[in-house]
Structures are given as structure tokens and as C-alpha cells.
Amino acid sequence: MFFQTTIVAALAFLAVATPLALRTDSRCNTESVKCCNKSEDAETFKKSASAALIPIKIGDITGKVYSECSPIVGLIGGSSCSAQTVCCDNAKFNGLVNIGCTPINVAL
């Protein structure tokens, strides 16, 4: 009986003492999470009037373009997110038009 208790206690000690591995696969922090009310393909965006608002070569844009973005923290004040929650860790042109964001699945 004493031997079993010692083994269980030793295993419990090892489980508690083992350090947790730091996950570095996702760098999206709370400041990078945005709620974007509009999302469109880059090709559609290139044809829109909004494309004239950003000072980069339009041909360089690929993937999705998100607009009307606000921080998730702002949702507490009564805003609503009707399209897509994104991580804008490496985003360009924060707010009006966001390029370089990654969609994330967050239940709000």
C-alpha cells in the first residue's frame, strides 16, 4: 500500500514539475485581432474604388483584402462584427484597408 502511494505521489510530482512547452506557431496577440465587416478577393478589390486609396502597387496584392476593421476590444462598446474575425499581425494600412491578415475562427 505504501509503495503504491509513493509511486502515485512521484508521478503526480513529475506531472506538476514538467515545464509546459511554449507554443510559438501563432503570433497573433489580442492587439492584432480585428473584426472586419468587409472581405473580398484581391482581384475584386483591384477593380473597386477603394483600391485608389492605398499607396502601393495594386498588382502586388494577392489573397483576401479586409476593410472596415476595428479591434475586437471595440466590440464591447456596441459594434458588431458581421463578416470576419482576422489576425492582422503583419497587416498593412490598419483600419481602412487591411492586407496581410489571416482569418481566424472566434465565436463572439
Swiss-Prot record:
Recorded phenotype for the gene knockout or disruption: Alters the cell surface structure and mycelial hydrophobicity. Exhibits relatively slower aerial mycelia formation on a liquid medium and leads to slower growth under stress conditions involving SDS and H(2)O(2). Leads to a marked delay in lignin degradation on beech wood sawdust medium, while the production of lignin-modifying enzymes is not reduced.
GO molecular function, one term: structural constituent of cell wall
Reported induction: Expressed throughout the culture in cell wall extracts, but increased when the aerial development becomes prominent. Expression is impaired by carbon source limitation.
PROSITE patterns associated with the record: HYDROPHOBIN
Domain of life: Eukaryota
Keywords: Cell wall, Disulfide bond, Glycoprotein, Secreted, Signal
Localization in the cell: Secreted; Secreted, Cell wall
Pfam family, any one: Hydrophobin
Endpoints of the signal sequence: 1-17
Gene Ontology CC terms, in alphabetical order: extracellular region; fungal-type cell wall
Keyword Disulfide bond among UniProt keywords: yes
Biotech relevance: Vmh3 can be efficiently used in surface modification applications such as antifouling agents, in modifications of biomaterials used as implants, in designing drug delivery systems for water-insoluble drugs, and also in food foams.
Glycosylation sites: 37
Disulfide pairings: 28-87, 35-81, 36-69, 88-101
Family affiliation: Belongs to the fungal hydrophobin family.
Purpose: Aerial growth, conidiation, and dispersal of filamentous fungi in the environment rely upon a capability of their secreting small amphipathic proteins called hydrophobins (HPBs) with low sequence identity. Class I can self-assemble into an outermost layer of rodlet bundles on aerial cell surfaces, conferring cellular hydrophobicity that supports fungal growth, development and dispersal; whereas Class II form highly ordered films at water-air interfaces through intermolecular interactions but contribute nothing to the rodlet structure.
Subunit structure: Self-assembles to form functional amyloid fibrils called rodlets. Self-assembly into fibrillar rodlets occurs spontaneously at hydrophobic:hydrophilic interfaces and the rodlets further associate laterally to form amphipathic monolayers.
The protein's name in its UniProt record: Class I hydrophobin 3
Source organism: Pleurotus ostreatus (Oyster mushroom)
Gene this protein is translated from: vhm33
